[in-house]
Amino acid sequence: MTSTSDSPGMTREMLQNWRVAALARERDGADSSIATEEQLLASRRQLIADDADCSDFWVFGYGSLIYNPIIDHTHRAIASIYGYHRRFCLWTKIGRGSPECPGLVLSLDRGGSCRGVAFQLNPQNAIAELDLLWRREMMTLAYQPRLLSLHTEIGVKLGLDFVANPNR
């Protein structure tokens, strides 16, 4: 099932046609820190290779991914992670902020635990969905992608999540 949102926020199409990055570059200004497509692909490949086995691959949502996942997934489950907690700890000049007035966004910070929703990716197109997710979450490189244990009602699953990059 592919999730869409009725909200005027981010859509699959905006990510697929790279419109989100263009809008972000406009908003970010001349010294834009928006990642290039090549940087995003290299980042994803560093963690998950193009030929990775994604037959049982999950993504953990703790914020906007819960209500607007926009990824093709076959199953969802309530999940908990340990070692990270949800916190408004990243500043942004795009989306919820501007260059003149940065806004805070949720991230996962070290310590504690967090409850959210795990989405099982459709294995038929998992790598393409991960690339779409990288465009969404890694556009400013403010997050670090991590493979974590997701504790669900159907067992512990390996899953991807994005945690606060302490260097940003």
Residue ranges and their predicted role:
Residues 1-168:
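Glycine-aromatic micro-motifs
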